[in-house]
Amino acid sequence: MKKTGVMNSNISRVIADMGHMDWLGVGDAGTPVPAETEKIDLSVRPGLPSFIDVLEEVLKELEVQKMYIAEEIKTENPKQLEAIKRTVPNVEIEFIPHSELKKDLKSSKAFIRTGEETPYSNVILESGVVF
């Protein structure tokens, strides 16, 4: 039995399979996940688990070189944006239109759905290398 880190076997598998520049999405309960993208659904009830809790745990295990965030979060959910920035102080952030972020999920290895119900609580993480 795994003792530490992300306990969800599907998340652990996807992270272990990530290569340089692969994408992994993490987001709120309302995000439409493309049929071709694996969905790892963690939602239990509204707000559980939270987007930030899941993101923080994923970031403990995944080397991230870049994060894509919907530009709409700047005006529609600035509190969440500040929380995201605190989790990745040294990672490049690129803001893109929300419609583009949703389309880009087609190229992600997987999408982790949380119970979050606040607007634009979605990111795409681009995997880096550890050497």
UniProtKB/Swiss-Prot annotation:
One of its GO terms (molecular function) is intramolecular lyase activity. Pathway: Carbohydrate metabolism; D-ribose degradation; D-ribose 5-phosphate from beta-D-ribopyranose: step 1/2. It holds the Pfam family RbsD_FucU. It is an enzyme of class 5 (isomerase). Substrate binds at residues 28, 98, 120-122. One of its GO terms (biological process) is D-ribose catabolic process. Keywords: Carbohydrate metabolism, Cytoplasm, Isomerase. It is found in: Cytoplasm. This is D-ribose pyranase. It comes from Lactobacillus johnsonii (strain CNCM I-12250 / La1 / NCC 533). The lineage of its organism: Bacteria, Bacillati, Bacillota, Bacilli, Lactobacillales. The gene is rbsD.
